[in-house]
Each structure stands twice: as C-alpha cells, then as structure tokens.
C-alpha cells in the first residue's frame, strides 16, 4: 500500500461542479486545488464579469470560503486570445491557468475546442506556449488532456508538445474522446507511460472512485497527484477517503449537504437552477448511496424550487427522527 498522501484536485466538470458545488465540497474535504468550469474563449478579450460569473472565488482572493485555491480553465483554439484571457484571469486572482484539451462534448468539439484539439498536437503546442508566455513564471500553467481522439497512438506526441511548450504540469484522463466515460476503457497504464516519459508532474484522472481505486491508480501510474470529478459527486468526502482512508460520509451527513446546497442563495436563479442540480446530484449519489435512489423517485416529478426544498427538508427530518429513535 502506498502510504504517502497524494495531491488531490477537484476536476472542472462543466454544468456540474459549479461555484456552489465547489463551495460545498471544499468545505467538507481537503482539496489542494479546484479547477473552474471552462471559460470559452473565441476571438476577444472577455469582460471581467464572465470570469467572476464562472469563478466568483476570484472576488475573494482566488479562494473558496474554506481556503482552497481556484484555477481558471480556458477553452478555445486561438493562441492569441487564449493568451490575452489567461493574462486577465491571472490579474483577477486565478491561481495559475488550466487549458482544456479534453472536453468530449459534441458541442465543444464541433467548434474545434476541448478534445478536438487532440487531433492537432501542433496547435496544442502553440496555444500552451502562448499561454505560458503571457502568464508570470510564478503562476503555474497546466493542461488537461485525454489519451487521444479515437485511439491512444498520439498520446506521447501530445504530452511531449505540452511539456515542450512550457507547461508546469499535465492532467491526463485515461481514456480517448471516443471512449467517453466507459469504465472498461480506462487506461491507467498509458498515464503511467506518460509519467515516465515527462519531466513535469503528471496528474492521473479517471475512474478514481474510492480509496482502493486511488491506490491502484497510483501504483500503476506512479503519479503523486490525482484529479477527481464524478467520484467526488458520488462520495462527497472522497478526498479525505483517498488521503486518509476514512469511511465514506454517512447518508445523514449527505442529507445535510443536500439541505445546505438547496438553501444556497443564487441571485441568477429563476427557480429552476437548484431543482435541476439537486436531481442531477442525486443521480451521482446513487452510485454510492442506495438511499439516493429513493429520494430521487420522490423529487423527480417536482418542478418547483419550493417543492424540491420541502422534500429535502422532510428527508432530513425523517432521518433525524429515525436516528433519535
């Protein structure tokens, strides 16, 4: 068993790990870093409000309420504009810059962003180099990649390009774009080969769901850093589970998190935001908590915020009553 404690980073999951979820999960965990949802860059220097909307932590020194640093992730294909927006993100307080070369979304790939860049290692090199040159050397530049578009044959060329461009570290999701998130397609061995090849830190990502899978991933890859996304939603205290081999959070504690989440003020919410996000989160939670299946069945047909909130409060009350008895 590997006894050293790994760096644990909270992944950038678009439309899932939003500022509210980051605030909640970093309060109950021990993350070393969290990465924002991507900021889409096209052909302009974006207004500050775009960065503040996606990463409001920038308004408080680049930290979550619990003190976890936030790194802004940029998505795009034009080196000049990626560089200009990277510079702005640093000025606003981002702890370094992350460049997205792994998002498998059809919409994103259709506009030549995210994983679509894996087809063009030279463009990845140019974009990463432009970002690195625009950002002060004291600020880290990282790149998140997959093993390739439809096969892993170019993974070394891509990783080499990222290192040669001056990136400080690289996060490798152990599947190709076409693999999607199929568990049986995870390839930690390829991450390990990249780690052996490079001189910069390599962070492993993909199918890290509990203490045992984290241990196995580290044994195979020899990576000292891990990035977790879906697993962090399945098991809300996963970083502590991985770092300290503690038990997963009890369902009663998960209910309290759901209660906190549904009560978080959101001035942009028209009444549907928390409704959709609670249902979405329950779908992740049911991978680790059978009780989440029952709660989802209760709320799935509820379309009002007040209705969902009432169901969550009732579930908390029932649980407290059961525990008291």
Swiss-Prot record:
Keywords: Flavoprotein, FMN, NADP, Oxidoreductase, RNA-binding, tRNA processing, tRNA-binding
Active site: 103
Pfam families associated with the record: Dus
InterPro entries attached to this UniProt entry: Aldolase_TIM (IPR013785), DUS-like_FMN-bd (IPR035587), DUS_fam (IPR001269), DusC (IPR032886), DusC_C (IPR042270), tRNA_hU_synthase_CS (IPR018517)
Binding site for FMN: 12-14, 73, 144, 205-207, 229-230
Co-factor requirement: FMN
GO MF annotations, alphabetized: flavin adenine dinucleotide binding; FMN binding; tRNA binding; tRNA-dihydrouridine16 synthase activity
Bridged cysteine pairs (disulfide): none
Reactions listed under catalytic activity: 5,6-dihydrouridine(16) in tRNA + NADP(+) = uridine(16) in tRNA + NADPH + H(+); 5,6-dihydrouridine(16) in tRNA + NAD(+) = uridine(16) in tRNA + NADH + H(+)
Residue(s) at site: Interacts with tRNA: 40, 100, 181, 277, 279, 284, 300
EC number, as in UniProt: 1.3.1.-
SUPFAM superfamilies cross-referenced by the UniProt entry: FMN-linked oxidoreductases (SSF51395)
Function of the molecule: Catalyzes the synthesis of 5,6-dihydrouridine (D), a modified base found in the D-loop of most tRNAs, via the reduction of the C5-C6 double bond in target uridines. Specifically modifies U16 in tRNAs.
Family, per entry: Belongs to the Dus family. DusC subfamily.
Protein name in UniProt: tRNA-dihydrouridine(16) synthase
Species of origin: Haemophilus ducreyi (strain 35000HP / ATCC 700724)
UniProt lineage: Bacteria, Pseudomonadati, Pseudomonadota, Gammaproteobacteria, Pasteurellales
Originating gene: dusC
């Amino acid at each position: 068993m590997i006894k050293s404690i790994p760096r644990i980073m909270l992944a950038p999951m678009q439309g899932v790990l939003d500022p509210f979820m980051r605030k909640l999960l970093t309060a109950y965990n021990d993350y070393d870093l969290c990465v924002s949802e991507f900021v889409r860059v096209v052909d302009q220097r974006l207004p500050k409000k775009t960065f503040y909307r996606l990463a409001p932590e920038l308004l408080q020194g680049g930290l979550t309420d619990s003190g976890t640093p936030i790194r802004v992730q940029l998505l795009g294909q034009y080196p000049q504009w990626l560089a200009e927006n990277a510079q702005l993100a640093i000025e606003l307080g981002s702890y370094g810059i992350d460049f997205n070369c792994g998002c498998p979304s059809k919409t994103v790939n259709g506009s030549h962003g995210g994983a679509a860049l894996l087809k063009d290692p030279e463009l990845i090199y140019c974009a990463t180099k432009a970002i690195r040159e625009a950002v002060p050397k004291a600020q880290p530049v990282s790149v998140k990649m997959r093993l390739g578009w439809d096969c892993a044959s170019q993974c070394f060329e891509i990783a080499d390009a990222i290192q040669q461009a001056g990136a400080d570290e690289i996060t490798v999701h152990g599947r190709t774009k076409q693999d999607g998130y199929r568990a049986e397609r995870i390839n930690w061995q390829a991450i390990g080969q990249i780690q052996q090849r490079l001189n910069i830190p390599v962070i492993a990502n993909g199918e890290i769901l509990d203490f045992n899978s984290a241990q196995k991933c580290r044994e195979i890859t020899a990576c000292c850093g891990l990035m977790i996304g879906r697993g962090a939603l399945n098991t809300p205290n996963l970083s502590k589970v991985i770092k300290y081999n503690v038990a997963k959070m009890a369902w009663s504690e998960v209910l309290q998190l759901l209660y906190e989440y549904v009560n978080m003020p959101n001035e942009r919410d028209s009444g549907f935001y928390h409704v959709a996000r609670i249902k979405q989160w329950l779908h992740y939670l049911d991978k680790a908590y059978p009780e989440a299946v029952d709660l989802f069945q209760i709320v799935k047909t509820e379309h009002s915020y007040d209705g969902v909130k009432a169901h969550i409060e009732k579930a908390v009350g029932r649980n407290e009553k059961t525990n008291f008895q």
